[in-house]
């Protein structure tokens, strides 16, 4: 099965190991990975900040880059959601609406692809300890991926997965929200960390690097002994 990897900006710039884990995991599951070097940002930051014209240029570039893929897989619910939004953004724009739909229809978040397309629930991972899972806003509310990550984590040998109180509350990242509304964002992430501490988790696992950077940065600043991991790293752990 041919998979074209949409690596995302945050993985490319700050979390290279997440990209490596994604590739190794999918290859172990029998996929052939393709990586278009021309890929850039999906346009989400510009679009959400109101720079629609500039964002559309980035989106058109990504459509041209990915439209011939068999499957498009990304280790980010947020960026997968943006690809899924392309047809709506280009609605009424003849050629580009159709091309955007072709890209959107074959785009999957990593865990969604493993469970729904590959039909795999146990990837053979092993990790000792207690973990809790942070459900990112875009992935659950917009993309609608809720069960796949937990299904995969429940099959990780040695890992006890405990529910996170107020799991669906935002961590305070929200892209540019954390910059524009710093004090509010800080309170939100502090509440998230309190919930993580409440369940005495060794690991905080998530599927979006933006959330993990926000939560992980605050955990580090507070000196808490909690390891933050992307779900791709967990599923690739042996």
From Swiss-Prot:
One of its GO terms (cellular component) is cytosol. Pfam families: CCG (PF02754). GO terms for molecular function: oxidoreductase activity. One of its GO terms (biological process) is lactate metabolic process. InterPro entries: Cys_rich_dom, LutA. Is involved in L-lactate degradation and allows cells to grow with lactate as the sole carbon source. Belongs to the LutA/YkgE family. This is Lactate utilization protein A. It comes from Anoxybacillus flavithermus (strain DSM 21510 / WK1).
């Amino acid at each position: 099965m041919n998979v074209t990897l949409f690596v995302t900006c945050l993985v490319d710039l700050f979390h290279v190991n997440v990209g490596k884990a994604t590739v190794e995991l999918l290859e172990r599951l029998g996929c052939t990975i393709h990586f278009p070097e021309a890929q850039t940002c999906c346009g989400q930051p510009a679009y959400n900040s109101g720079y629609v014209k500039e964002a559309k240029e980035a989106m058109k570039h990504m459509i041209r880059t990915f439209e011939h893929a068999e499957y498009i897989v990304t280790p980010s619910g947020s960026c997968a959601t943006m690809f899924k939004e392309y047809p709506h953004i280009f609605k009424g724009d003849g050629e580009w609406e159709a091309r955007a739909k072709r890209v959107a229809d074959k785009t999957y978040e990593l865990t969604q692809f493993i469970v729904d397309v590959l039909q795999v629930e146990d990837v053979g991972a092993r990790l000792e300890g207690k973990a809790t899972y942070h459900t990112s806003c875009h992935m659950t509310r917009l993309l609608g991926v809720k069960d796949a990550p937990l299904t995969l984590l429940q099959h990780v040998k040695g890992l006890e997965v405990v529910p996170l109180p107020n799991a669906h509350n935002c961590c305070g990242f929200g892209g540019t929200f954390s910059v524009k509304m710093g004090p509010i964002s800080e309170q939100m992430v502090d509440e998230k960390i309190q919930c993580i501490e409440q369940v005495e988790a060794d690991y905080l696992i998530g599927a979006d690097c933006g959330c993990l950077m926000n939560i992980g940065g605050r955990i580090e600043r507070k000196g808490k002994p909690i390891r933050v991991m992307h779900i791709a790293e967990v599923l690739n752990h042996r």
